[in-house]
């Protein structure tokens, strides 16, 4: 459940501006999800293409309580959404905008071994010191980092990210 003391995570206008997308309807979301099984009511469902195409799950997302969906083709069935050319690129832009709007201390852990353990230790310390945000699980790849950024409340005072890479140049500034 969203903290009532926090602003909405994203409004339709903010998300459209951040992604250069087209907002369909007026909405405000409290979370961002890529999985209908863990989606919470009020979330933005991001229809990423991976082994399966997330567009196939948009109807399930709305049935689970999604407030809107980030899509690249109209599968919204009249529900609110955000239309972009490429969903992953839209998520990346949302993550960049979240970083730009935040003035808190942002840290990252990289390396070959121990990233998750160090990130969890630092997250525990940060939580004790105020409003903190951190990577869920080991979401440290090309979609996990922008997802974690896009989920970061604007009121975050300290954040810790886990960043991994598979190929040279994959980690962007």
Question: Model regions: which residues?
Answer:
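N-terminal leader/targeting and accessory segments in enzymes
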Residues: 1-93, 97
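Phosphate-binding loop of NTP-binding sites
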Residues: 14, 91-173
């Amino acid at each position: 459940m969203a903290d009532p003391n926090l602003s909405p995570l994203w409004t339709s206008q903010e998300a459209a501006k951040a992604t250069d997308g087209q907002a369909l309807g007026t909405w405000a979301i409290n979370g961002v999800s890529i999985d209908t099984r863990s989606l919470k009511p009020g979330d933005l469902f991001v229809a990423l293409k991976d082994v399966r195409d997330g567009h196939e799950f948009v109807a399930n997302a709305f049935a689970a309580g999604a407030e809107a969906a980030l899509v690249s083709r109209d599968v919204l069935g009249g529900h609110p959404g955000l239309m972009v050319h490429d969903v992953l690129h839209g998520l990346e832009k949302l993550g960049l905008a979240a970083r730009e709007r935040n003035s808190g201390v942002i840290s990252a852990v990289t390396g070959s071994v121990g990233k998750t353990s160090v990130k969890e230790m630092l997250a525990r310390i940060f939580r004790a010191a105020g409003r903190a945000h951190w990577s869920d699980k080991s979401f440290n790849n090309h979609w996990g980092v922008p997802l974690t950024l896009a989920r970061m409340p604007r009121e975050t005072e300290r954040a810790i990210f886990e960043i991994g890479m598979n190929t040279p140049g994959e980690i962007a500034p």
